[in-house]
Amino acid sequence: MKFIIAPAKKMIRAQDDFPVQSQPKFRVQAGELLLLMQQLTFSEAQALWHTSDKLTQTAYNQLQQSDLTRQQSPAIFSYSGIQYQYMAPDLLDDAGLVYIQQHLRILSGLYGILRPFDGVVPYRLEMQNHLPLPHHRNLYDFWGNRLYQALARMPGPIINLASDEYAKAIRPYLQAKDQFIDVRFAHRVNGQLKTRATYAKMARGEMIRFAASHRLTKAADLKNFDSPTYRFNAHLSTATQLVFIAK
């Protein structure tokens, strides 16, 4: 069983409490993308990121100084969005950390696909950003089936905890033999099911922590996820989607 999740826009340079254990599989390709980004003007970068002048200036300065080989920190501690805060990987025991290194993959616009302890540096590039590429239409085209192939080499079903933006980098390449299971966290609003993004991000992080803490190996075991907000709904779930409804 392997989980896929999205990265976070907000990144930090993590402290040295947890060392880098591995390098990104597609570090060469990430270097190519970084070089293209570093050639952008301030205005082009702002158009790419859709950011304010102040945020663009900070990110642009960081971009010009970026070096993928220096001042790395583990990916799992470098992303600091809501999902990662609720995952709380720093609170996992050693066996839990080994579990996420083996079973969790982070999809990334810049790096393609990451293991939790791959060394990364802060960057700003979402999969849906329209970075001008010389031989490709967009980042989905740039990465092609490489991210799927990396997942396909791992045993077991793919548990999709990623946003649609990042799951789109995998879905087109799925084969009949693949077991791809979406996880949905929803609220009942006026008789309809609605996803509330912030709560869903919290739950995704908590589910990863739950799986790591219990060393889960079967997708069916995720039905026992003890979320403070959501409960598994067997009636709405299918073989390809696990549905959790707000209590």
From Swiss-Prot:
Transmembrane segments: none
Highest taxon in the source lineage: Bacteria
Gene Ontology biological-process entries: response to hydroperoxide
Pfam families listed in its UniProt record: H2O2_YaaD (PF03883)
InterPro entries: YaaA (IPR005583)
GO cellular component terms, semicolon-separated: cytosol
Family: Belongs to the UPF0246 family.
Protein name per UniProt: UPF0246 protein LCABL_22600
Species name: Lacticaseibacillus casei (strain BL23) (Lactobacillus casei)
Source taxonomy: Bacteria, Bacillati, Bacillota, Bacilli, Lactobacillales
